[in-house]
Amino acid sequence: MKRDMGSYKMGLCCSDKLRMNRGAPPQDVVTAFVEYTEGRSHMTAEQLCRFLVEVQDETEVLVSDAEKIIERITCERHHITKFLRHTLNLDDFFSFLFSDDLNHPIDSKVHQDMASPLSHYFIYTSHNSYLTGNQINSECSDVPLIKALKRGVRALELDMWPNSTKDDILVLHGWAWTPPVELVKCLRSIKEHAFYASAYPVILTLEDHLTPDLQAKAAEMMKEIFMDMVYFPEAGGLKEFPSPEDLKYKIVISTKPPKGSLRKDKDSESDASGKASSDVSADDEKTEEETSEAKNEEDGFDQESSNLDFLTYSRLITIPSGNAKNGLKEALTIDNGGVRRLSLREQKFKKATEMYGTEVIKFTQKNLLRIYPKATRVNSSNYRPYNGWMYGAQMVAFNMQGYGRALWMMHGMFRGNGGCGYVKKPDFMMNNNLSGEVFNPKAKLPIKKTLKVKVYMGKGWDSGFQRTCFNTWSSPNFYTRVGITGVRGDKVMKKTKKEQKTWEPFWNEEFEFQLTVPELALLRIEVHDYNMPEKDDFSGQTCLPVSELRQGIRSVPLYDRKGERLVSVTLLMRFHFL
């Protein structure tokens, strides 16, 4: 039997004797305060600046920055509207360290090189971006598109189909029972929210089931709605993708070139080079009905009309899609004449990495590779994203309306680089080593770096959970799981002891992680309430890119199962690299 937090608080006077004391600073915090104040009761801006440089490794911080921190903390804690006191006491210092606004665990600004071609970046990518729930009969809507863009997703997918009278365009999941949404509504919402979270380009992946006249209509819609936001590539196709910096505030179209387009001679010399293919045809699981219908539509096209229509539509396509119809090896062949996108369902991608792992990585050094969930994931679950990232796949497409550890990893990866939706791939994935070999994620590699993680304490569950699944009669017994996900040799999970009967658990435990590929590693953090004999209650999670961790004592905010911020729920942790 479960009950909400309010009913739990009413039972605080019971014999359970719940410990509700406000957490005192850990000894490491006290020691640092004493050391940098030289034993005095207050810390000056100069002393705080020294602490930030020497302990927090913030080498570019100035005394003026420390003064702003002191002013902010003083105003918040003591309600001083005028900056009269220029120092922090121990409690103020502790409050600063526990502030995820002022002392966040990773850099909140874009800091990576954004001037390389798109193929050099992992791109925050959504699958069936318009679905509100499962893949069978959930409603199609522009709301999931808006949510994804606000979260920082940079690549969206729209499935375009003719309406029943063949004179307008709907967005829906084909061969299912999903109530459709009008394309025009989706495009307007994309325009309005495209750059809410990031200035870098939105890639619109179109799965095209339209006749030439409707393709032309779609092109006119996009030009009319997006106006100067839409990016027009150079005539004849690209030799190399533009950079995210080049494409700032632009919407980039990716789909199959229409049949008979000017790109045909160049891009369709073989199926591997971009012959008319949507994500559906990039998989040999196509149904006979689907293949037959596509052929009938093509055979029924009016050639005179389509010659005019494809000029309008194909002019918008920056990233032509390819397929694996003639086999994986041919699909992964590098075409020195241009660049393209290849889309593979997760099972076919797994097969590709098992048979042609080296070719996959070489392909992604120049081209884009998109992976999407298998058809049996009707509940909108997701696969492990590292399966794609380890082989350089830029567009690991996820069902953003789902939840679970795979989605937590996705959120974690793209908290990196200021949450802009583009994360630079490590140099070793883009360049061959001295022996001319590409990166092999299955190889046994030497330890490159050691990460020490100390979990001090947590707070906020008493106010952060409006309703909770904590056990009715037992007080919270929180513990934290800390681990690494990444290449096979780096994967590990550890956990703290259970902290008995308290809303503000204090663990003060340290863990050490030896990493062979820290550039691809994520730090996983989960908090649970021990609930024997039932299943332990989930109490918060986060994932953080190891390469982005800021050294020192940091405030780490936690999120719910769907990746939404748990208001006030925070851990105090310390990170140190050896």
UniProtKB/Swiss-Prot annotation:
Topology in the lipid bilayer: Peripheral membrane protein
PI-PLC X-box domain residues: 112-256
Q: Which residues form the C2 domain?
A: 430-560
Q: Which reaction does it catalyse?
A: a 1,2-diacyl-sn-glycero-3-phospho-(1D-myo-inositol-4,5-bisphosphate) + H2O = 1D-myo-inositol 1,4,5-trisphosphate + a 1,2-diacyl-sn-glycerol + H(+)
Q: Which GO molecular function annotation, any one, does this entry have? A: phosphatidylinositol-4,5-bisphosphate phospholipase C activity
- Keyword line: Cell membrane, Cytoplasm, Hydrolase, Lipid degradation, Lipid metabolism, Membrane, Transducer
- From the Swiss-Prot or TrEMBL record, state where the protein is found: Cytoplasm, Cytosol; Cell membrane
InterPro entries in the record, alphabetically?
A: C2_dom, C2_domain_sf, EF-hand-dom_pair, PI-PLC_fam, PLC-like_Pdiesterase_TIM-brl, PLC_EF-hand-like, PLipase_C_PInositol-sp_X_dom, PLipase_C_Pinositol-sp_Y
Q: Tell me the GO BP annotations in alphabetical order.
A: intracellular signal transduction; lipid catabolic process
PI-PLC Y-box domain sequence ranges: 314-430
Q: What is annotated as the active site?
A: 127, 173
Record function comment: The production of the second messenger molecules diacylglycerol (DAG) and inositol 1,4,5-trisphosphate (IP3) is mediated by activated phosphatidylinositol-specific phospholipase C enzymes.
Q: How is this protein named in the record?
A: Phosphoinositide phospholipase C 5
Q: Which organism is it from?
A: Arabidopsis thaliana (Mouse-ear cress)
The beginning of the lineage is: Eukaryota, Viridiplantae, Streptophyta, Embryophyta, Tracheophyta
